[in-house]
Amino acid sequence: MKVRHVLACAVALAALAGCNNKTKTGGNAGTPTNDAVTITQANPPPGGTWADVVNETAAGGYMMGNPNAKVKLLEIGSLSCPHCKAFEDEGVPTLINDYVKTGKVSWEFRPFLIHGPVDMAADLIVRCNGLKSFFPLAKALYDDQAIWMGKLEAAAPDKVNAIQNLPPNQAFVQMANLLGLQDWAAARGIPQAKSNQCLTDQKMIDREVQVVSDVNNDYPDFTGTPGFVINGKLVPNVAAWSGLKPALDAAVKE
C-alpha cells in the first residue's frame, strides 16, 4: 500500500512524537540509523532451527533467524495491508523454509503505520505477548485480516473519527475494540487486562511512531508497504515474493 504520510502523522494525536517528513535531518539519507539487534537468543534451541530464533531489533522490529546471517532481509510491513498479507501467504513459507532455516538469511519484520490508529492497535496487540509470540500472532492476524478490517469498513465514519480524536491512552483501546482485536487476543492467550496495558503503553506507542520517522528518514525512496531492504539497501519497485526472490538469491550468492 502507498504511504499515507498525513494519516501516519495523524496517529500522533498531539501527545505522540510528531512524524518527521522524508528529509533526513542528520547523516546520509538511505543509511539506516539503527540496525543493531538485542540478542537474547543466539542459537537455535535443541532440536530446533534458525526459524525458532527471534530477537528484537533496536529499530523497533522483530528478527527471525541467525542474527549474524550473511543476508539480512528487512520487511517494512503493515498488518492491515492486503499486499502484505499476500506476501505473508505467498512468500513467507518459502522464505522461512528455504532461506531463514539455512542460517544464511535473517528476516526482520518492522511494523509501519500505513493506516494510522488501525495499525497502531494491531501492532500493539501482536507485540503484547513477547518475542516468541510475535510472528505467530502476526500470521494469525493476517489470516483474519478480512474479518477485522471488515469491521472497520462497516463502522460509521463518525464513530471512527471520534475514536481518532480521543487521547492516545483511550484511542487505541477503543480502536482495538471496534476491530474486535481484544476479543481476538483473549482467544489466543492475551487477557483483556494485559491487552489494555499494551494498548495504553506510552513507551510502546512512542516506539511505533518512531519507526515511521526512522523509515522515512533512512529509506527516502520507500513508497509503500510492503517494502524490502536487503543488507541495508532498499529493493526498488518490489512488493511481492516474485520480485523479491531473485534479489534475495543474488544476495545469497554474493
Give the role of each language-model region.
Residues 17, 145-148, 204-207:
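A short hydrophobic/aromatic micro-motif that marks alpha-helical segments and, especially, helix-coil
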Residues 62-66, 141, 145-147, 235-237:
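Surface-exposed, interaction-prone regions with an acidic/low-complexity signature
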Residues 2-9, 14-119, 212, 216, ...:
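Extracytoplasmic thiol/disulfide redox context detector
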Residues 85-172, 220-221:
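Structural alpha/beta surface segment adjacent to cysteine/selenocysteine redox centers
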Residues 65-68, 83-88, 113-117, 126-129, ...:
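Extracytoplasmic/periplasmic, Sec-exported soluble proteins
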Residues 49, 166-167, 224-225:
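Secondary-structure junction/capping motif
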Residues 3-6, 20-37, 78, 171-254:
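C-terminal cap of thioredoxin/glutaredoxin-like
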